[in-house]
Design a protein with these regions (language model features):
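Structured catalytic-domain cores with a bias toward divalent-metal coordination
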Residues: 1-158
Length: 158
C-alpha cells in the first residue's frame, strides 16, 4: 500500500536542475568551465613550498543542461588498479564507440573524473599514503593535520 502511494506521488525536479534557467559555468579549481565543454586540469594534492605537490589530472565534463554534479574518484587505495583504468577509459576517445568522447552537448549536469587520487600510493603500488595512513579512512580530513588528512581535506572541499 505504501509503495502504491509513493508511486502515485510525483517527485519535483530540484530548482537548480530546472531546464528553464539555463546552465551556468561550472567553477572548479578557480577555473570556469563553460556549458557543453570538457576541460582537463591539474590539481595539486598538497600545497607545499618544498618538495613535490603531487599533481593529479582531473577531467571535468560540464553538460549543456542543468543537473547534478558527480565526482568519480579512482585509486583512493593506490594498489587498486581497476578504478584508474576504468576512469581513464571513460575520458578516452572510444568510450562512446567509433572514436567518440562523452558528448557534453547532450549531458545534463557535470561529471568530474579523477583517475588517481592516491598518487604516491599508486606509484608504489601501496594501499597507503607515505605516512602509512589509509586515505579512505581520513575523509573529510583536516587541513592542519597529517599529510593524508590534509589531502583528504583538499579532495573533500574541491
Amino acid at each position: 500500500m505504501e509503495i502504491e502511494k509513493a508511486l502515485g506521488e510525483v517527485a519535483e525536479t530540484p530548482a537548480k536542475w530546472s531546464r528553464n534557467g539555463g546552465t551556468k559555468n561550472h567553477n572548479f579549481l578557480k577555473k570556469r568551465i563553460k556549458p557543453g565543454t570538457i576541460r582537463h586540469l591539474e590539481y595539486d594534492l598538497l600545497d607545499v613550498e618544498i618538495g613535490e605537490s603531487w599533481p593529479i589530472p582531473v577531467s571535468v565534463v560540464h553538460g549543456s543542461r542543468p543537473g547534478p554534479v558527480v565526482t568519480l574518484l579512482g585509486a583512493v587505495h593506490g594498489d587498486e588498479l581497476v578504478g584508474p583504468l576504468a576512469l581513464t577509459y571513460l575520458c578516452g576517445a572510444n568510450f562512446m564507440g567509433d572514436d567518440r568522447l562523452i558528448d557534453p552537448s547532450v549531458l545534463a549536469g557535470t561529471i568530474r573524473i579523477v583517475p588517481i587520487v592516491n598518487l604516491p600510493g599508486y606509484r608504489r603500488r601501496s594501499r597507503y599514503f607515505p605516512d602509512r595512513r589509509d586515505l579512505n579512512r581520513s575523509f573529510p580530513g583536516n587541513p592542519d593535520s597529517n599529510t593524508t588528512s590534509r589531502v583528504a581535506s583538499g579532495v573533500w572541499k574541491n
